């Protein structure tokens, strides 16, 4: 039985978790808009990458993968640079970034010069759909199967993914996908974080999403004095 854990490297949190999340966990970062779920994920991986490998009961990732469904790498890295200047150089050299925004925006009305990188020249070939653009879910599954083993993965975000899926499938199919993702995460033996904005879905549906997870962390604005 594998009892290793993935620490968050947040000093106030790991003792509560008795060392961290069990390896193979799918963890939902559920938060009000801008309440800190992104900052938690980045702070955690930065501290983990900077931590000496000493504890044999602690699992250190093979790699850290950031999967973005709508934002390009430069956009995300700029936010990290502003929010965590002390960690930026270390993260940029060790973070494997996967941009699935082309798949997300494919066949939408968004003009190609908006969704493509500045380096992309408009041509006949650039207007063709590649395999990754044809199906966002298939592209995500394929990437996870190749990269998630022993890794920490951040999926940005479940809010975007769920809304995209529900335009193409029923609610029960989305829940089935999430349960499959939770099961697959055990095989990958790493840690998968995914972010969901509070209040996007009805309360019972949000709770159904939470039920698919191994753990849920809730981020809220301090309402003291309001």
Name every feature range the model reports, one short phrase each.
Residues 7-21:
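Pre-Walker A adenine-sensing motif
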Residues 26-30:
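Short hydrophobic/aromatic beta-strand immediately N-terminal to the Walker A/P-loop
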Residues 70-74, 102-105, 159-160, 198-202, ...:
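Conserved nucleotide-binding/hydrolysis micro-motifs of P-loop NTPases
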Residues 183, 190-226:
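Phosphate-binding/switch region of NTP-binding enzymes
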Residues 50-51, 140, 172-199:
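Substrate-engagement module of ASCE P-loop NTPases
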Residues 32-121:
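Conserved P-loop
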Residues 17-24, 56-59:
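Phosphate-binding P-loop
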Residues 103-182:
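Phosphate-binding/switch loop-helix module in NTP-utilizing enzymes
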């Amino acid at each position: 039985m594998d009892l290793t854990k993935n620490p968050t490297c947040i000093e106030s949190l790991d003792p509560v978790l008795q060392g961290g999340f069990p390896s193979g966990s799918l963890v939902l970062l559920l938060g009000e808009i801008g309440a800190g779920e992104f900052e938690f994920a980045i702070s955690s991986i930065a501290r983990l990458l900077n931590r000496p490998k000493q504890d044999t009961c602690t699992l250190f990732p093979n790699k850290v993968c950031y999967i973005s469904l709508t934002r390009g790498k430069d956009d995300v890295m700029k936010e990290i640079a502003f929010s965590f200047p002390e960690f930026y150089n270390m993260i940029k050299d060790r973070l494997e970034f996967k941009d699935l925004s082309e798949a997300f925006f494919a066949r939408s009305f968004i003009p190609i010069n908006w969704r493509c990188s500045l380096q992309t020249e408009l041509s006949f070939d650039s207007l063709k759909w590649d395999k990754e653009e044809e199906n966002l879910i298939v592209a995500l599954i394929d990437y996870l199967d190749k990269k998630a083993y022993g890794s920490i993965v951040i999926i940005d975000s479940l809010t975007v993914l769920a809304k995209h899926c529900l335009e193409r499938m029923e609610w029960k199919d989305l829940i089935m996908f999430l349960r499959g993702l939770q099961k697959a995460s055990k095989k990958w033996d790493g840690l998968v974080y995914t972010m969901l904005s509070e209040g996007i879905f009805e309360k019972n549906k949000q709770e159904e999403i939470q039920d698919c997870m191994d753990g849920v962390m809730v981020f809220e604005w301090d309402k003291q004095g309001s």
